[in-house]
């Protein structure tokens, strides 16, 4: 692989602790058996909620399918003084100087077009796995031709879009190619308010979904999958209750491809419809939707990246050095408490073919187990 100018390339098989307070590891989480049966593994990976309402469910259709790809994973941790730690300091002695550790991993090497192909295949596979599990699956072409489905996607959010998590973590969310994303879990506050106003007029995406289910006499299925490349764990920013001092700041990272998600059913038998403002509205009774979700992510031990590079910028290093110096001087002077910043950035260089193959296999395994568990709940 070509080295980036000024960047340190880290071996994909041997990562060390590179920054004080930041431990990096490639230890492998337990992976599922891709060659084993879904039924025998489902209980180890999939949990069921409201599964009793699967009784009688046969004719189904996938009304939404969204795949979220992790592209940026971040976490932070910090040291902190406990309750009254400064008040108990003797006059004229050094004040406490704390540090905040910030670590970011960015995935590079796979573009949106490839992610879209993975999402398309995962959504097609969802229908296949439901059929293999014994459900009567209405083809997507039939659903797509329905005017309620078209109206639902006219109210959705354009795909792909960036979803921002905590501490700078970022994901790309993609639906089926050429279709929008209508699941409220992916819609931000502004769009959510917009949907609420539309609901008053009977035109929200969810209401179109309800009418579609009634029109085609099917149980709606909503599929959500997350493909992530890194799992970061922080030891936090303060001790429990804040009474004791916290003298460590650590972020642990596991670089491993994993899939998680859920498959939600909206049983037609639990749907209630009524008329409001001259329009029919339909919804599933509260707490009557069976959901089959991962309790443990499906992970693979197979390699999907070529290397990991330290891409901490000069600006990051200057900021870290400046805040550490300032914190030391402030503490020594006894004039103020201060927090230094320690910033580190890594780039995970993906192997497109490996990332593609492993992502598809993980998504397929998740869907097969969820469909199997759903079928056995009927």
Where are these regions (language model features)?
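A structural "domain/chain start" motif
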Residues: 23-121, 125-138, 143-178, 183-256, ...
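Bacterial N-terminal signal peptides that target proteins for export
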Residues: 2-11
């Amino acid at each position: 692989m070509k080295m980036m100018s000024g960047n340190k390339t880290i071996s994909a098989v041997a990562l060390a602790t590179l920054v004080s307070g930041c431990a990096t590891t490639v230890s492998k989480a337990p992976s599922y058996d891709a060659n084993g049966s879904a039924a025998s593994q489902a209980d180890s990976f999939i949990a069921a909620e409201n599964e009793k309402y699967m009784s009688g469910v046969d004719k189904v259709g996938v009304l939404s399918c969204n795949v979220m790809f992790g592209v940026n994973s971040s976490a932070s941790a910090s040291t902190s003084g406990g309750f009254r730690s400064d008040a108990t300091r003797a006059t004229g002695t050094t004040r406490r100087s704390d540090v905040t550790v910030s670590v970011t991993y960015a995935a590079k090497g796979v573009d949106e077009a490839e992610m879209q192909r993975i999402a398309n295949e995962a959504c097609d596979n969802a229908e296949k796995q439901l059929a293999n599990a014994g459900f009567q699956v209405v083809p997507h072409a039939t659903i797509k031709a329905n005017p309620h489905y078209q109206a639902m996607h006219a109210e959705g959010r354009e795909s792909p879009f960036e979803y921002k998590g905590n501490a700078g973590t970022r994901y790309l969310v993609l639906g089926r190619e050429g279709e929008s994303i209508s699941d409220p879990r992916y819609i931000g506050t502004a769009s959510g308010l917009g949907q609420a106003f539309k609901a008053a007029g009977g035109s929200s995406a969810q209401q179109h979904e309800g009418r579609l289910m009634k029109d085609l006499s099917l149980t709606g299925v909503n599929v959500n999958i997350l493909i992530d490349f890194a799992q970061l764990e922080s030891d936090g920013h303060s001790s429990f209750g804040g009474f004791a001092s916290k003298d460590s700041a650590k972020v642990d990272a596991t670089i491993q491809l994993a899939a998680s998600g859920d498959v939600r059913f909206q049983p037609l038998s639990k749907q209630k419809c009524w008329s409001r403002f001259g329009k029919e509205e339909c919804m599933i009774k509260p707490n009557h939707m069976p959901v089959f979700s991962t309790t443990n992510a499906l992970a693979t031990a197979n390699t999907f990246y070529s290397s990991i590079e330290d891409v901490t910028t000069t600006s990051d290093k200057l900021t870290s050095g400046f805040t550490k110096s300032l914190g030391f001087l402030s503490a020594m002077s006894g004039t103020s408490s201060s927090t230094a910043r320690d910033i580190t950035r890594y780039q995970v260089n993906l192997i497109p073919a490996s990332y593609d193959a492993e992502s598809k296999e993980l998504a397929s395994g998740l869907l097969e187990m969820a469909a199997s568990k759903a079928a056995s709940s009927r």
